[in-house]
UniProtKB/Swiss-Prot annotation:
Bias (Basic residues) ranges: 9-19
Family to which this protein belongs: Belongs to the bacterial ribosomal protein bL32 family.
Protein name (database record): Large ribosomal subunit protein bL32
PANTHER family: 50S RIBOSOMAL PROTEIN L32 (PTHR35534), LARGE RIBOSOMAL SUBUNIT PROTEIN BL32 (PTHR35534:SF1)
SUPFAM superfamilies: Zn-binding ribosomal proteins
Keyword Ribosomal protein: yes
Region (Disordered): 1-22, 34-60
GO-annotated biological processes: translation
């Protein structure tokens, strides 16, 4: 089993953990429908950046 040779200081431990923070996902509001969706993703109605890119199943 691997054992560290020297104790890691609190500063180095903190630097090691600096990338472990949780990030809130970016949420956008569709200007045409007002629905929320993840950034760079299509809204549930099939709109992206103000344009309808997918047709709804009810319309097809």
């Amino acid at each position: 089993m691997a054992v560290q040779q020297n104790k890691k200081s609190p500063s180095k431990r903190g630097m090691h953990r600096s990338h472990n923070a949780l990030v809130v996902p970016g949420i956008a509001v569709e200007p045409t429908t007002g629905e929320t969706h993840l950034r760079h993703h299509i809204s549930p109605n099939g709109f992206y950046r103000g344009r309808q890119v997918l047709k709804n199943k009810s319309e097809a």
